[in-house]
Amino acid sequence: EAIKLEPDFIEAHSNLGITLQALIRLEEAIIIYKDAIIINSYYPEVHYNLGNTLKELGQLEEAGISYKHAIALKHNYYEAYSNLGITLQDLGRLEEAEINYKQALTIDPDYATAHNNLGLALQELGRLEEAETSYKHAIRLNPNSPDALMNLSIVQDYLNNLDIAIIQLKNLLIIDPDNYGLRAAVIIAIYSFLENDFSTSKKYLLQSSKIENYLTLNFKNERIYHQYLLKILDWHENKPFPLLNKISDRKLYVIGESHALVSHGLHVKFLDKSFLCKSMLIQGCMQWHLGNSIKNKFKVKFENIIKSISNQSDVLLSIGEIDCRLDNGIIKHRKKFPKKNMMHLITNTIENYLNYVYKINSYYKHKIIIQGVPSPNIETKNISKHKILELINLIRDFNIILKNKSTELGFGFLDIYKITNRGDGFSNEIWHLDNIHLSPQGMLEAWKNYSSY
């Protein structure tokens, strides 16, 4: 109504844009903000709000331009600096993001959100101690910030300070029980499982059962772990004998992403020796992360774990399945760069990963076994034949090259693909626990076929 009476009333345009944005009518909000800028391009808040709306729509480059316009008009606009930092971080421009977060904090050192966001950028850059400091600043300014508490727990995990991580997670159970607390409960369940406290693990999984109803992206990771770990625990509960009592067995450290969890607590035998598997988790770790020349959080945790175990230990590395998914890793990268050769991408990923492991292990002399990637166990109904063939060929070739390169470097190779392949590259559905992971029984079966380092 105000706009009808006075079409050049910029505050009315701005307020209408904010209202439309709150109603998730983002395209309409953008039109209104742009109309306002035509009326008066010197109104920094309109540029800022336009940037926020564009960011919500994923139009990151355009959002960045709007934030820069806002900052040019209002040099002390610390919120715009912080949001520009978020946009740059989402674009993968982490060093630029860091600069903008720090500029926001120069203007307002008590801006807790910028401390938290700076921590996220530093974490992705592999500067974990600095990230820890930033999160602690954010928590000091806002002790009940679930974002900062969760992020601090995550960085403590990558630093391998699991006891400290658990303290932050337990705080989240109290502060935000129906949101971040659900995610925290799942993570505590994982830690409890890895400490062989299966009953406590089950308790926290049951406590967080509502997470199955949370379908947003923020909960996806913990929701998958919730389902997966429940199935692992059910398998252990249904075994007729306790698997964790043979303390005389030599330890086999299983280091990796979610696929490492299923081995924990299993007794395996190879080369006439018995081993008790102890899993050590690096959530979301890909071969690409470790083979990358740039320092990152995954490398920091991997190296912390490798250093934490006795020299010349037996180690199984369970990393690589995430590199071989339809929506991630090599296929996702090739979609972005379609001219790149698939075999070159596979070989490059594997060689960089294995060379990194070989170099890091040169001092510790661990006896390394590389775990292969299972045949895919996916629903193909809504996937094109081209995509299915691409995935099948990728996983087949990935395993062949991974095995050959592992052998060249003197590593053992645990062939998961062989026992899961029904003959055409798809899973035989015998050894999978879910659509992604093998069952504990599947891992035991794989070890029956293992012959040497």
Language-model features, listed with the residues they occupy:
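Residue-level recognition of tetratricopeptide repeat
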Residues: F9, Y43, Y77, Y111, ...
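Conserved alpha-helical positions within TPR/SEL1-like repeat arrays
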Residues: E11-A22, E45-E56, E79-D90, T113-E124, ...
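Conserved SGNH/GDSL esterase-like catalytic core that processes O-acyl groups on lipids
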Residues: L252-N352
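Active-site segments of SGNH/GDSL-like serine hydrolases
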Residues: G320-D323, V357-I392
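Extracellular serine-dependent O-acyl
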Residues: H366-P374, R396-I430, N449-Y453
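Substrate-gating cap/lid alpha-helix
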Residues: I378-I416, I436, Q441
